[in-house]
């Protein structure tokens, strides 16, 4: 079994809905919504993209025949629903051209859709351009994943030039570049560094869903690094960390998104759109995966409309004026990190 298929099997094995920091955020219910479902517009826009719903499928897989089947199904679902989809890391196809079709199948199924290509931060300008050319990607995701690399038996050990390489790519390619974590979250300091090198967008991708340290540790013979299973900031904390950067960077959120309520909470905390991966992957890998996942996406579209209505909001942009209350764990984090946690409850 190659590493890509190992990741798929382990992600499925470890996937379970569990409590996370989205449960520490509560909306303030208002009895008079003064809204109607048929008046709600759940579309969103960021960078140069207009999207019919405020969530997307985040980077998952590619580089094997099993992964090709999943990407084909994602392409079909995206065409049917208008979903933006990001591929898994295309590094495998850059090393072995015979694997290119495991990613290109998504474009074949969805020729006019929005698809992001994904590469690691250790790659350079030429690899970035080749990744975009694989299937005429609309944007480039560059993932940063130091904890995963360190736990991965064959992972990278030198991260000294990542920022320099990202900056060079930002200057060289003609499409937007989104820097994405892989489930470990982002801090204020990280966002400041990304802004300083000209990055336009960041997907803070926090802890709370799929743990790639857990997955990579399961691939180690002794499995001795389990203490890193929950390393990092949650998606909610990462969005709180991003508050002072949301006017300078396009902020996207992902990591541990289980349902439509999590999506709307992330939007209320300032994300322009929310990415989903683990929940979608688990659905696709179940019996009747394609049909079930298409139904799930359509269900979420309707539920998001209901939630906007419940909150008395007619557009995605209005959600950032919705009152919400953070529990003491989140308030304590904000206090220690110099973030004003009181503003959310008074909006």
Swiss-Prot record:
Keywords attached to this entry: Cytoplasm, Flavoprotein, FMN, Isomerase, Isoprene biosynthesis, Magnesium, Metal-binding, NADP
Residues engaged in binding FMN: 59-61, 89, 118, 180, 205, 210, 256-258, 277-278
Co-factor requirement: FMN; NADPH; Mg(2+)
Stated family: Belongs to the IPP isomerase type 2 family.
Organism phylogeny: Bacteria, Bacillati, Bacillota, Bacilli, Lactobacillales
The protein's enzyme class: isomerase
Subcellular location: Cytoplasm
Protein name: Isopentenyl-diphosphate delta-isomerase
Keyword Calcium: no
Record-listed Mg(2+) binding positions: 149
Chief place of localization: cytoplasm
E.C. number(s) listed in UniProt: 5.3.3.2
Source species of the chain: Enterococcus faecalis (strain ATCC 700802 / V583)
Superkingdom of the organism of origin: Bacteria
